[in-house]
Amino acid sequence: MIAFTATATAQVKFGIHAGTGIGLMSKDVHDDRYEGQNKTDKEPFSTSSYGGFFVEIPASEKLLLDLRAIYTNHSTIGKGKTMLHRIDVPLAIKYDISGLRPKVGGYVSYIPEVTSFEDKYRSFTRKDIEKFDYGALLGLEYNFNEKLFIETNFYLGLANLLTKDPRHSSDYLHTRSIFVGLGYRF
């Protein structure tokens, strides 16, 4: 039993990864809810970044579980720009095809901080944004060797990040992000 546990533990890999992304925060907000903001913003994207740690647990020869702890920043787009500082915990299942690893999973996020960029438009503040987010994750990873890899991930937020406003129940803010990065296993 001890030998089996030691063998299974030796196959678990730890690592770091970081990268940049395109934030496609989806937003629809009425003008009278937040002074100066458009009902729908048309700007296509904003930039974001991420970095964190991961653990990779083999479930079989080809199937792996991927658990991560990541800091990300997401910016809302359009007038009244706001940056959401997030701690994401994604969990994905990866399948190894000769170093190419498609993955699918989900994530939960805690949003401890919101940075408002004051200009002539009002930005969202901490009280306007929910503290938690969740959603689906799709990705693809290419491994150059056993240690170094590149990755791309798409986060599809399912939670409405705006706090409730009884006047505008149809207002919403959702996470939509594409990240591209580099990772290293120890």
For every predicted segment, state its role:
Residues 10-53, 111, 120, 183-186:
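Short glycine/proline- and aromatic-enriched beta-strand/turn motifs that initiate or cap beta-hairpins
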Residues 16-18, 67-69, 91, 104, ...:
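Membrane-embedded beta-strand positions of outer-membrane beta-barrel proteins
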